[in-house]
A protein has these predicted regions:
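Core SAM-dependent methyltransferase catalytic element
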Residues: 178-200
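A short, conserved alpha-helix within the catalytic core of class I
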Residues: 108-120
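Conserved beta-strand signature within the Rossmann-like core of class I S-adenosyl-L-methionine
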Residues: 127-136
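Class I SAM-dependent methyltransferase SAM/SAH-binding core
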Residues: 33, 41-89
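Conserved Class I S-adenosyl-L-methionine
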Residues: 143-167
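Class I SAM-dependent methyltransferase Rossmann-like catalytic core
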Residues: 1-29
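Conserved class I S-adenosyl-L-methionine
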Residues: 28-38
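A short acidic, Gly/Pro-enriched loop at the edge of an enzyme's catalytic core
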Residues: 91-99
Length: 200
């Protein structure tokens, strides 16, 4: 029997709304780096729907085999095999005009979030766009009871995880040369945060 591909039901539910965001903000882009491709479901869906984009997948080493299963089945010419990417380095020796990451900032440690944003000036071209999807707090408050419960679950699983404060993340983004372009409400109490890389 062929090896079963990894599958996450939330990816199936949110891929449509996220694609609407990407169609707008990645219009005219050429090369996108996905940080934390996870199961690979998002990459296949977005690369298939956006054939003008070269979509580079990445994740930690243990997740690469599952991503390859999705990519090998899809056979999309614009979807690239995953590269190992740990936010603490090394990063790909390449530049991109789009970066996408979904449901990663609340999983990695805050030190990891800082490392991710610190690396962006070398990775994201001037005028490039970062799209980050996931739940966030505002003014220190959760946007829903379900997000508060999810945050508690995250912290029980790993003390370093947790839903991040939008204001703190945006300040971090600004310190890396990014300007907030849009904060879009998404289904299931998530957000799509879009930043643009300022010129030097």
């Amino acid at each position: 029997m062929p090896e079963a591909k990894p599958h996450a039901e939330p990816c199936e539910r949110n891929k449509g709304p996220i694609l609407e965001v990407l169609r707008q903000h990645f219009a005219g882009r050429r090369r996108v780096l996905e940080i934390g491709s996870g199961t690979g479901q998002h990459a296949v869906h977005f690369a298939g729907a956006l054939p003008g984009l070269i979509w580079q997948t990445s994740d930690l080493e243990p997740n690469l085999a599952g991503i390859r299963l999705w990519i090998d089945e899809a056979r999309l010419p614009n979807l690239k095999p995953p590269v190992v990417l740990d936010v603490f380095g090394p990063w790909p020796d390449a530049q991109f005009d789009g970066v996408f990451t979904a449901n990663t900032l609340h999983i990695m440690s805050w030190t990891g979030v800082r490392a991710l944003f610190a690396a962006l000036p070398a990775i994201l071209e001037e005028g490039g766009v970062l799209v980050a999807y996931g739940p966030f707090k505002y003014d220190g408050a959760f946007t829903s009871a379900s997000n508060a419960a999810f945050d508690g679950w995250l912290k029980r699983r790993s003390a370093h995880s947790g839903i991040r404060d939008f204001e703190t993340v945006d300040a971090l983004a600004q310190s890396s040369g990014l300007t907030l372009l849009e904060d879009r409400p998404m289904p299931a109490n998530n957000r799509a945060l879009i930043w643009g890389m300022r010129g030097s």
